Amino acid sequence: MATAQLQRTPMSALVFPNKISTEHQSLVLVKRLLAVSVSCITYLRGIFPECAYGTRYLDDLCVKILREDKNCPGSTQLVKWMLGCYDALQKKYLRMVVLAVYTNPEDPQTISECYQFKFKYTNNGPLMDFISKNQSNESSMLSTDTKKASILLIRKIYILMQNLGPLPNDVCLTMKLFYYDEVTPPDYQPPGFKDGDCEGVIFEGEPMYLNVGEVSTPFHIFKVKVTTERERMENIDSTILSPKQIKTPFQKILRDKDVEDEQEHYTSDDLDIETKMEEQEKNPASSELEEPSLVCEEDEIMRSKESPDLSISHSQVEQLVNKTSELDMSESKTRSGKVFQNKMANGNQPVKSSKENRKRSQHESGRIVLHHFDSSSQESVPKRRKFSEPKEHI
């Protein structure tokens, strides 16, 4: 019987460098991590349609990477933002990227969910925290450790996005870039960005802050954090989160300084990825069926010239475009396939969320909590720092 073996072409295969001995190799890795993180988040949160992604392989993990697509202007715009991030990253100006989701096109400062990607530049080669907190300091690290940390971070993002409650049907995206002011020229702006007007944002509902993870090389440190509404965490599997949780006080402001990450006002819900991965290893068949495709490639962002074989199932098309009364409004389904039951009253009317009640009480009392991405708790008045926002929103 004739058999055929599927070969991964060099263009479709993505591998980490065998070793990270130069700053350029480290930069390529960090770019890949940023690309696959953003792609994973936007794909699993259902922000763009299936056609906006192409398929790539991260070792044995099939992943999706965001690409320019003439039929999806939003994905094309986000690709341009990413290229602007790369420009600032290469110049060592970029300190943090904030990708925020909001629901009112007229009010991009009121957000519903956001993702923070933080960057540090170093020549000391710090070790990665995911192995052990008691490790001795070394001047270099094994590339296998970097590779393991990178895959671990991607899997953490995947599992968190898979288990979060769904976003509203219609959402918009914006991005804010923060810099190291001491080295960034005052007039510098990456391609596609302009000087920002409002440093802080208003967060809808009660925020939950999550430290997803980090990857370190001898030249860079890359961290990922997520802020979402607590209501989206209600149905999350308790085994996914680390048992060492700190309760979030209502409407606490996140002071996003590394030195404050261990303070009480910052919720540190670390993802317990090992437990989830062990469950998947015990049941590999179900894991293979449930794990969606995520991705990255050599230059991180695929171009619209490529035409990978993508298939869109009927259920996915319905999820993206069918908004008729025939839809069952008692439940919603994420792209990962997980079904969430909507809260209903009297069998047919949705229950008003506590988020809506909180927003109403805030407006009635005149209290609006400002969420500062970039300020110190020791500053009575947050210092005005340079940051950028897109010339065009999605």
Curated annotation (Swiss-Prot):
Keywords: Chromosome, Differentiation, Meiosis, Nucleus, Oogenesis, Phosphoprotein, Spermatogenesis
Phosphoserine modifications at: 376
Biased composition (Acidic residues): 288-300
Domain of life: Eukaryota
PROSITE patterns to which the protein is assigned, alphabetical: HORMA
Cited InterPro entries: HORMA_dom, HORMA_dom_sf, HORMA_MeioticProgression
Positions of short motif Nuclear localization signal: 383-386
Maturation and modification: Phosphorylated at Ser-377 in a SPO11-dependent manner.
Composition skew (Basic and acidic residues), residue ranges: 253-282, 362-374
Any one Pfam family match given in the protein's UniProt record, by short name: HORMA
Annotated Gene Ontology cellular component terms: chromosome; nucleus; synaptonemal complex
Subcellular localization, as worded in the UniProt entry: Nucleus; Chromosome
Polar residues bias locations: 310-324, 343-352
Domain HORMA, residue spans: 24-226
GO biological process, one term: meiotic sister chromatid cohesion
Tissue: Testis-specific. Over-expressed in carcinomas.
Region entry Disordered, spans: 253-394
Assembly and interaction partners: Interacts with HORMAD2. Interacts with IHO1.
Described function: Plays a key role in meiotic progression. Regulates 3 different functions during meiosis: ensures that sufficient numbers of processed DNA double-strand breaks (DSBs) are available for successful homology search by increasing the steady-state numbers of single-stranded DSB ends. Promotes synaptonemal-complex formation independently of its role in homology search.
The name this protein goes by in its record: HORMA domain-containing protein 1
This protein's encoding gene: HORMAD1
